């Protein structure tokens, strides 16, 4: 049986970034993923601010297009625009990102096992090692041994499951689909250099639609919604997607790829971060930003938080799980927790005229902000720039908010 210091299950941004950091530090690490290659199931809108691209050292070849502005279609059909001359961020080629991260793991000496599904993880009799069992695409079984196992399997939480989670912490579930379209130059120009969103119950009840530029001649168009347990499901995502394409005069574009996915997150982020020698990162511990609908940054950030703690523990055992949970919460900040509550209030309630009117008020209030200010709001949760007392009311939280 092969031995490693750390086994990481899931080669998405969180798992691959953790494996990359550990391999770079000389740790014997094995990265496992059920996909046969990283170009498959590349579901992510993958818009990142420039600061995150620099922080994670992502090379230029991963950037499909840069953006320097925003445009939002409001519930009443009015487009709102925010633009500046300097780039604010980039849309990544998500498949290329995953391929690059996993290639880096191998270059740095880590082991990569693709096309393998982890079936179980158990403690060895000695109590000092974990045995990870898996099955490859030929249904052949094998096992490996390690000091630590990290569940980076995303919303499926295939190993950590729901043990230790606060049952009173609301679980938010979202579904989305995205199509990669081939368009003519004029159509591409119309949507280039900005991130575009459609917000309102007329377009996508309980969610929103989007158009992101990719390489010249390509656009990513998608819809997503937060599931509302108290409301009967509305039109399917496929129906909503076709409606959005027709509204934007993109229904005649050639579809190059279709993909979709599920996102789960707990409002209070009470997920179990680890037990024994099993840890969890990324979407498995609700790192996603559900208000802005993006998860790559925080997933990779969770890897950056855990990596040095694992290195220290391998050298000298300590109370890793408690330190990890506290440091991650500190790194992502209090505003990150507030964003989860705002996401729940915003998207789950966005299916009535009253909710549309609140959204109209919010967009009117943002009219005089700069493009950079809007980025600070959606990516860094700088709510106070727009009046912390007013925002909860506009999002439908009701009553007075206490100042922080």
Q: What residue ranges belong to the model's regions?
A:
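Predominantly flavin-linked oxidoreductase catalytic cores and closely associated redox partners
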Residues: 21, 104-250
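Short beta-strand to alpha-helix junction loop
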Residues: 84-103, 227-235
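C-terminal helical "tail/cap" subdomain of flavin- and related membrane-associated enzymes
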Residues: 308-404
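FAD/FMN-dependent oxidoreductases across multiple families
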Residues: 227-310, 314-321
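Glycine-rich FAD pyrophosphate-binding loop
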Residues: 21-42
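N-terminal Rossmann-fold NAD(P) dinucleotide-binding loop
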Residues: 15-16
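N-terminal FAD cofactor-binding segment of flavoenzymes
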Residues: 35-72
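Beta1/beta-strand and adjacent pyrophosphate-binding region of the FAD-binding site
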Residues: 1-12
């Amino acid at each position: 049986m092969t031995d490693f210091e750390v086994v990481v299950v899931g080669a998405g941004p969180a798992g691959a970034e953790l494996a990359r950091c550990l391999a770079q530090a000389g740790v014997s690490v094995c990265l496992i993923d059920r996909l046969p290659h990283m170009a498959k199931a590349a579901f992510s809108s993958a818009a990142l601010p420039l600061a995150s691209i620099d922080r994670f050292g992502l090379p230029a070849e991963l950037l499909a297009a840069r953006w320097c502005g925003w445009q939002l279609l409001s519930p009443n059909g009015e487009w709102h625009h925010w633009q500046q001359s300097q780039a604010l961020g980039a849309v990544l080629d998500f498949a290329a990102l995953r391929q690059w991260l996993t290639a880096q793991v191998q270059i740095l000496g880590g082991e990569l096992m693709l096309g393998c599904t982890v079936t179980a993880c158990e403690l060895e009799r000695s109590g000092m090692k974990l045995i990870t069992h898996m099955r490859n695409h030929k249904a052949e079984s094998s096992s490996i041994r390690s000091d630590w196992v990290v569940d980076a399997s995303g919303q499926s939480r295939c190993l950590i499951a729901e043990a230790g989670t606060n049952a009173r912490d609301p679980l938010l579930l979202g579904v989305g689909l995205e199509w990669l379209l081939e368009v003519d130059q004029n159509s591409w120009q119309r949507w280039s250099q900005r991130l575009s969103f459609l917000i309102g119950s007329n377009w996508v009840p309980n969610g929103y639609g989007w158009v992101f530029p990719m390489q010249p001649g390509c656009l990513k168009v998608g819809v997503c919604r937060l599931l509302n347990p108290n409301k009967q499901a509305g039109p399917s995502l496929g129906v909503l997607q076709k409606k959005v394409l027709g509204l934007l005069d993109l229904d005649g574009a050639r579809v190059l790829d279709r993909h979709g996915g599920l996102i789960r997150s707990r409002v209070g982020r009470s997920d179990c971060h680890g037990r024994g020698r099993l840890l969890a990162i990324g979407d498995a511990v609700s790192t996603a930003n559900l208000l802005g609908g993006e998860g790559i940054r925080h997933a990779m950030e969770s890897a950056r938080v855990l990596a040095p703690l694992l290195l220290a523990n391998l050298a000298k055992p300590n109370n890793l799980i408690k330190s990890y949970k506290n440091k991650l919460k500190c790194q992502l900040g209090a505003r990150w927790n507030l964003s989860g509550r705002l996401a729940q209030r915003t998207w789950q309630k966005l299916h009535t005229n009253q909710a549309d009117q609140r959204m109209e008020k919010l967009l009117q209030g943002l009219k005089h902000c700069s493009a950079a200010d809007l980025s600070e709001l959606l990516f860094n949760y700088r709510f106070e720039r727009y009046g912390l007392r007013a925002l909860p009311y506009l999002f439908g939280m009701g009553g007075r908010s206490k100042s922080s």
